[in-house]
Amino acid sequence: MIAVIGTRPQFIKHASLEMAARGKMDIESIHTGQHFDENMSSIFFDQLKINTPKYNLDSEGKTHGSQTASMLIGIEEILLDEKPDFVLVYGDSNTTLAGALSASKLNIPIVHVEAGLRSFNKNMPEEINRILTDHTADTLFCSSPEGIHNLSKEGIKNGVFLVGDIMKDLVLHYTSKDSKLDKLYNFDYYYATLHRPYNVDNKDRLMQIFDVLNTLDHKVVFAIHPRTKVNVGKYQIDLSKFENIHVIESQSYFKNLDHITESLAVITDSGGMQKESYWLLKKCVTIRSETEWTETLRHDANTLVFENLKDIQNVINLAPKKFDDSLYGYGNTGSQIVDTLINNYQKNLN
């Protein structure tokens, strides 16, 4: 099997799959290079103990169209040479779409992990990537019953499996370790990250968010994403003027989990952190108008705030009513995926 990866969330998902697949199936990977910051890429491979990708492409810093086209060309050449039994893609990035389209054009079976998600906002590039990938995939692994429902409404009913969320495997694996961490800071804090274009690619919008974070009743530890950092420089925003915001560099995966664990609440526009906050029993405020992770909105565990940014403080003060330990599975998603793929492959041979 060839797995196509290129973004931070995909490295996390692939680490879980590799752990589950050891001794059972052969996996090679293509790294498209979509994420290029050291903490967003190379350190992840060391920290997550992911095998070094057999192939590396250079797709950073391009527009959506040129980036996807560049990936398509590179992935197709590799697939023609490797002739894998199937190609596996994760999530909803340009890497996901490029991997799926490349395999589809070559009639190689496609496996989509995290299938069926819908935000119902087609202005999001990720939403288009999800839909197109699902409609080319042969085997679709869903994180929740809602994913299966969404696929069914679009006429996709065959090859669909409910397995839970593969990111939960790694979160539970890490937090199960019996180790007491030193306290990260000598103050209580909210943990914040931002990277979506609609939040960070406009100076006025970005300043509005910083202004509100600066008024919150506890300090905000702000892990600055590479995209956000570039824009802060471009817009000549002096972050030192926001005394309530403590800026740190983007964090490696486990450090990010540590920051969530010690925080009072999480403020983000990240998809993955909405789930990680839930699993780590932290209130999450999502600075978006919609989310594909609709289940987290239940019981006030996650709340969407987009237009009325001043609502963030009030939303944080609303304590979640309940956390469901079974949301998105029980931490064995990787094993379910591997076993299903092996069983289906053996059936096809017979």
Segments (PLM) and residue ranges:
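Conserved C-terminal portion of the radical SAM core fold
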Residues: 225
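Nucleotide-activated sugar donor-binding and catalytic core shared by glycosyltransferases
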Residues: 1-219, 228-350
